[in-house]
Amino acid sequence: MTDNNSKSKDSSQKIPNDSLTPTISKGLRKDVFYWTKAIAYTTWNFFDSSPVTPQRNPISLFVRGLSHPFLRHRLSKSQFNEWFLSHNGVDPVQAQTLPDPLLFDIPDHQETSYSLLEGYSVTAHDHSDTSPLPITSSNQKEGKKNVSSIDVSMVSDSSEFKPDSLQHEKLVKKCNQLRLQKLINSSELAQIDLELSKLYSRRRQVLERLSKIEEQNLKYTSKLASVEKLMLDSDAQDLYSSYSHDLIPSQIEAGKNGANPDVFDDTHDKYTDNLSARAISPRAPRPSTASEVVSDYFEQNSAFSKAPENTESSVNQNYIVGNLVKQFQAHSEYITSLDFSHPFGTLATASTDKTVKVWDMAGVVYLGSLKGHSDYVSCLAIQDSFIATGSMDTTVRLWNLDNDVLHKDNPVEESLNSPPDQPVDNATNVLTSHTAPVTALALSSDDVLITGADDKTVRQWDIVTGRCIQTLDFVWAETHDTSTSQILVSDTYKQEPFIRALDCLDAAVASGTVDGLIRIWDLRIGLPVRSFIGHTAPISSLQFDSNHLYSGSYDNSVRIWDLRSGSPINIIPMEKKVNSLRLYQGRLAVASDEPNVRIFDTVSNRNWICSIPSHSDSIAAEPNSVPTSVQYKDRFLVDGKSDGSVSVFSA
């Protein structure tokens, strides 16, 4: 009994002490926690680091106190971060979020057929294969030790480690690695294509804006030229009036009656000659009466601000070679010939629908047509505002666009201005010496016009007077040239025009005929001086270079001839017959019976294809449509197709 009572008393005395221990420890810990925060706050406000003791600051003192075991479990890492951010005036939520600029480059979630670990293993394997580390003698020794330490029991089972199974496992592993490499490269290529498409889209938008700016620039440049012309006319009229007051009355009366006073003797002849020359000349428009009297004044005031000649072509430097710039439907039938003055300038097109149309290339605006030919135009050339056209009606017509020769195709206006039975003819001059259809012509920069017809003659014209200067006769040349008299024309090409191609350079004229011969004529003597033999089909196009002659033929080839030796230095084979070719700064554009025009760089032997992209907003071309005529100037290429469409490419 005594022992039991003593045990119960001891237990009753221990119970209160054990129950008070957690309460005392919890209270003490709570007090110490609050006191620690108070001390830290006081230290933060009353102590600061000094240059002498930079290590003594509130943060260092507080962190030093955290090393006490009694406080470590109370102040966790998250509580310290919250305390630090709250005492530095930073919002904890804002400090834990990433800024928006860092979130912009996060790619969208995409499903891939390989994991990150697989991709890393493949790339790491490739890197180890491409740049293996050198094995030293110590590594070789360690390798031998490792090989000798392999447990023999691991390879004792012949059923698992047969040579065939090992080879199969290696091949499977290698195939998996190659598959992953293929997927990685395909993914990278798709990413590159996506970036390129975005860049191309941006580039196209910038080019569209630049084109609009260029059109506005052309419009305001035209307005500026009109205003300057009015200013010059006004100043010239004032000068003429002041000049007339200085004349005696007899001289004025003589001038009114048609007699030329002495003061006008020299100028009258000069201006009369200028008027006759400028009526057709492509160099300058016809001046007004006031301008005739004071032409010297115009020459002295030629320093008026003018638009640069290459202003229109500033856009073309930003295009990629072979890219489509514009496309439009010009005619309803086969385009026989086309030419343009300069990029974003005037474009003239001729077709078998018996129309010749003039366009503004800047905005693809139809300006009007040239009326006068009774049959379709087979060839044409344009220089500035001057156009020469050769037709199957045996005539050559000259047009000066500054003389308002364009027909607006207005039925009401046409019925009022001309009788129904009388054809409209707005040509400035008509050349009628040929007796057969005109099939080729060439217009040089020094105002030399050469035409060729089925009457087997080539004629040189004075474009001012409209007279034929000389005639180059092929019949006479064939009878006196024994080397070319034996060449026969195939029955396949007997219906083709006798002369399809002409070009001139200074006093030299190159002619290409249906028999595949190229003759070089000297205009000073009117005779052929050399013949280039090599083509086996009709010549379709010719163009001179400074030292070479480029020829295209129906024999599916383009030849480059050396003018000094007369031999071909290069032959470019084509898949089909060549319809037209043009050369610009060492790049040759060739239009054949293939769907697209090809550009060949004669220096670097590179080539491009001028194709129309499927995603473009261009018109739908006929399946069998081929380019029939091409022109190439100032990095811009224009081709006309058999379906009547016209395409403009950067080249």
Curated annotation (Swiss-Prot):
Query: Which segments carry the region annotation Disordered?
Result: 1-21, 125-144
Localisation per UniProt entry? Mitochondrion outer membrane
- Which intervals carry biased composition (Basic and acidic residues)? 1-12
Q: Which GO terms describe its biological process?
A: mitochondrial fission; peroxisome fission
WD repeats span: 330-369, 372-409, 433-473, 492-531, 534-573, 575-610, 620-650
The name this protein carries in UniProt is Mitochondrial division protein 1
User: What start-end ranges are recorded for coiled-coil regions in this protein?
Assistant: 195-229
Give the matching CDD domains: WD40
